[in-house]
């Protein structure tokens, strides 16, 4: 976890809850990328933009009925357009193929509740709670791709040590 994102969670979680309560589910609940962008927009990028949700790189690692999604999310940088590995955060989530085995699909489709699709509907109180829990999981799964200290270590290797 990234400490500044955890701090942002405690600062903005009520805003996220209000967002879920006042926006229809198709605005954030149809896929994990939209959910991640909502977490970035409402939690992390408030009060200032830290991550650039418009440049997220998404990868589905398996393309089968279940597996892992990973995302590379660049930090905002006013000095250059191309991020380096130090400027990126990665996030991951496991997914399933149906509302019984996939968290987001289960919330959206109302699995175990009313079994009504989320399209055009404001979420129920229990769905808001579940979206909040999933948002927290996404935030907890965000990690720096490489820290500045790790990057510096790469440059501190002495040529002579490897060429003996």
Question: Where do the language-model regions lie?
Answer:
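N-terminal domain-onset segments
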Residues: 1-63, 102-164
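Amphipathic, interaction-prone secondary-structure segments
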Residues: 38-94
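Acidic, aromatic-enriched beta-alpha/helix-loop junctions
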Residues: 88-109
